[in-house]
């Protein structure tokens, strides 16, 4: 006796509403675009897309000892999931320790956008330790105090919850492709 299973053909993944192209500037912010690290490319599936930038905005009237303006910094990452749910996108708590972060706290925060709408984001407070470049006699590290906000965008829903993101993603892929 045999059994035949009829499975639908896998269709193309629906296009995302997320704009992956980052601007060069936004108000006082300068976007210095960067590529995904080899570790990110190795850890995530090949069809995962990245848009990344280090964004700097000089603080008015705040100068370093060398006379340069002191900037505020935002590390911006947009990661667009590929077809493999398990190896294409994940919550930052999974990869931040490999990037030198020690996560000190995690909480939910409301983010209000210019339209007046709001949604919940995850807020992580961490310390990132990075080796100082150019130091030859001994290893020297500098610590950065970081705040990370993240959320996941589905077809028509936003969530800051990993399980919620997985369920939204599965529903969107079944219904919308």
Regions found by a protein language model. Give the residues of each.
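Hydrophobic membrane-insertion alpha-helices, especially the h-region
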Residues: 1-4
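Alpha-helical transmembrane signal-anchor/signal-peptide segments
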Residues: 7-28
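Short extracytoplasmic
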Residues: 21-57
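A cross-kingdom signal targeting lumenal/periplasmic-facing segments of multi-pass membrane
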Residues: 49-177
């Amino acid at each position: 006796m045999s059994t035949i299973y009829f499975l639908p053909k896998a269709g193309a993944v629906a296009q995302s509403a997320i704009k992956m192209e980052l601007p060069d500037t936004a108000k006082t912010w300068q976007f210095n675009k960067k590529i995904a690290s080899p570790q990110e490319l190795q850890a995530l599936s090949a069809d995962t897309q990245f848009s990344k930038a280090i964004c700097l905005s000089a603080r008015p009237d705040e100068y370093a000892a060398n006379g340069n303006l002191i900037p505020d910094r935002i590390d911006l990452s947009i990661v667009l999931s590929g077809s493999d749910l398990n190896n294409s996108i994940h919550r930052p708590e999974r990869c931040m320790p490999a990037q030198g972060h020690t996560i000190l706290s995690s909480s939910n925060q409301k983010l209000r956008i210019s339209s007046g709408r709001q949604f919940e984001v995850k807020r992580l407070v961490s310390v990132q330790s990075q080796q100082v470049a150019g130091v030859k006699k001994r290893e020297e590290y500098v610590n950065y105090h970081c705040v990370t906000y993240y959320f996941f965008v589905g077809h028509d829903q936003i969530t800051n919850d990993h399980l919620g993101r997985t369920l939204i993603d599965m529903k969107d892929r079944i219904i919308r492709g």
